[in-house]
Amino acid sequence: MQIQKKIEDITFTPMTLFGEEMEVSENIVMASAAGWYVGAICKEDDGFIQPYDRYTDYYATPEEAAKVLEAM
């Protein structure tokens, strides 16, 4: 997983999901082996960061995904 933004610059919002507290990020440009996309990450109590959700299709470049994020 790649993230286009520094972790310390990402805004996280506390959420309760399935009885568990976690912090979920704002929408950000991310990448996986399949390509670049707009999604979110979550931060667990121990500080572990992992992908949370993907909101768009995959794109070939981070610039393409960033344009979609700007339009959201």
Regions found by a protein language model. Name each.
Residues M1-I3, K67-M72:
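Short intrinsically disordered terminal tails
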Residues D46-E64:
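A short, exposed loop/beta-hairpin motif centered on an aromatic-Gly-Thr core
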Residues M1-D46:
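Short N-terminal "domain-start" leader segments
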Residues V24, F48-Q50, E70-A71:
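Generic alpha-helix signal with a bias toward terminal, lower-confidence helices
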Residues W36-A40, Y59-A66:
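A short, hydrophobic secondary-structure junction motif
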